[in-house]
Regions:
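Peripheral terminal and inter-domain segments
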Residues: 1-221
Length: 221
């Protein structure tokens, strides 16, 4: 989800974040060549196999390449945040709603068909929340640059999570089907709209899994 963004400034310079988090400014000193203001570090823009590639003079062993929209960090992080927030809200809303109805001694008023759809929707949400939670626990050490925990002894865990992506796909399919069925019931507009949001959140989890290569069939991590 992390990417290096190079920004073009109005005065013709470009800016890029440094390892410290500060922004460094570069001024063009030649064709497709920029030098750091007040320094000697340079960035050179070339093309490799038709892809725009930036070479850093202080890190020549790695390059920066223009990523497609599907791999945009801003897009995918937005999808992840939307999906996680929506699913957590859905997960918390159901017990809270039940408690409020119990306090008011009221019933949901939903028919058997609508209750079955809600049950299926809840099951799909639980599956995806567990799926995201498991991946977060596994990836958390990497976010802290603690790569020592990734050994062959956890290969089975990684493989299990990769295969569990099929459950996330099934949950998304169930969520879309529930939203489609909800639209053809006497449920309130709010309920139907919420079903669509939940379906989009479930699809968002699949999107993140596919783009992030969490749903794969190998142990190259």
């Amino acid at each position: 989800m992390q990417q290096t963004a190079i920004t073009a400034n109005p005065d013709g310079t470009i800016s890029t974040p440094e390892a410290t988090g500060a922004m460094a400014t570069y001024r063009e000193v030649g064709p497709q060549l920029w030098r750091k203001v007040g320094g000697t570090q340079t960035l050179a823009l070339t093309e490799a196999d038709g892809v725009k590639t930036v070479i850093d003079s202080e890190n020549p062993v790695s390059v920066l390449q223009e990523g497609p929209l599907a791999r945009s960090a801003a897009l995918n992080l937005g999808v992840l945040v939307f999906s996680a927030a929506t699913l957590l809200c859905a997960l918390l809303a159901w017990p809270l709603g039940a408690l409020l109805r119990r306090a008011d001694r009221a019933t949901s008023g939903a028919g058997p068909g609508l209750r079955k759809l809600r049950t299926l929707q809840r099951a799909a949400v639980v599956v995806d929340v567990l799926y995201l939670g498991a991946w977060f626990v596994l990836i958390k050490p990497l976010l802290n640059t603690d790569v020592g925990v990734y050994r062959t002894s956890i290969d089975w865990v990684v493989g299990l999570l990769e295969v569990s992506g099929l459950l996330a796909v099934g949950a998304a399919a169930a969520g879309v089907w529930v939203a489609w069925r909800m639209a053809r019931t006497d449920a309130t507009r709010l309920t139907r709209a919420w079903a669509v949001l939940v379906a989009l959140a479930l699809l968002g989890v699949v999107w993140v899994g596919v783009v992030g290569r969490l749903m794969t069939w190998n142990l190259n991590y």
